[in-house]
Swiss-Prot record:
Its EC number is 4.2.3.5. FMN binds at residues 132-134, 253-254, 298, 313-317, 339. The gene is aroC. It holds the Pfam family Chorismate_synt. Disulfide bonds: none annotated. This is Chorismate synthase. GO terms for biological process: amino acid biosynthetic process; aromatic amino acid family biosynthetic process; chorismate biosynthetic process. It comes from Halalkalibacterium halodurans (strain ATCC BAA-125 / DSM 18197 / FERM 7344 / JCM 9153 / C-125). GO terms for cellular component: cytosol. InterPro entries: Chorismate_synth, Chorismate_synth_AroC_sf, Chorismate_synthase_CS.
Amino acid sequence: MRYLTAGESHGPQLTTIIEGAPAQLELVADDINVDLARRQGGHGRGRRMQIEKDQVQIVGGIRHGKTTGAPIALVVENKDWKHWTKIMGAEPLTGDEEKEIKRKITRPRPGHADLNGAIKYGHRDMRNVLERSSARETTVRVAAGAVAKKILRTFGIEVGSHVLEIGGVKAEKTSYDQLSNLKELAEASPVRCLDKEAEQEMIAAIDQAKENGDSIGGVVEVIVEGVPIGLGSHVHYDRKLDAKIAAAVMSINAFKGVEFGIGFEAASKPGSEVHDEIAWDEERGYYRKSNNLGGFEGGMTNGMPIVVRGVMKPIPTLYKPLQSVDIATKEPFAASIERSDSCAVPAAAVVAEAVVAWEVANALLERFGADQVEEIEKNIREFNEKARLF
């Protein structure tokens, strides 16, 4: 599968087109809307979330609740567009209209795409950069991810996420009985944290950052359960599934690091404490006695849950802006201010779910065929039995 997105933060709509989804997949708008709503939640979101109440429109590829095998086209309208029709319109402006519009954005924000994008594409008004580089684009990435999650769920694979850290406050209690339990606990928390004590400290840290005109980042974790052995490949660098997932997580706005399993902790441990011992029983087949490697060996899934974490830096738009330089005058100024969040880590966990789900679903379809659901289900069932007895 593949998808493309189009649209700007304050344009009329955001669009994604998905190609390669199997036919006969049961899919309705509510399957997608539930994740769009989850993306908009979380303590620390800005005023924009009070304006936008995201709902998807399915405009192609689905008929009477089932995919047809044709490209799936999804649209999410921007409710705030009515206030931006002249500023963000596609048609040229008259001289009088140009005077009505607010000044060009010429003061880049440190940590954002503004200056680099303006230089790369020759934009004297950096709104052309920030509109597309905005995290608003993740709305339709979450929509695409919701389709991927429905594919995975159809074949018994579940995806969940939670927050491990915000603003230096770390969750200590992160244990859960099963993934459904983790998802329930995360959804009940305003910061998607399983540790109730840490949750309150995280909320306080977010409130303090907002009061200070500042922002804070954190760490999210995504878990995928029910994955067959052998998704991805060891034979070439660009077929390793953990590498694809790492790239996908790093593609999320403001993410600066990724790890699997115990991750960077492995650097300080001997191999005997890192590698997961192999066992077999008649019911499960092959399994690992631990999951330090986060479900991957040699770029391939090993049947254990995929466990991946991503680090999100603080959002670069600050209400107490850092110093910058005006590209029109070359004079020092405080950076431009756009409406923003003080913390988007809980929402970023939902985005991370989406991009991880996409890569896993893509690898699943690549391995087991992609034309129609019934064939894929048969292929997975036969392979799992073969792997159990191997």
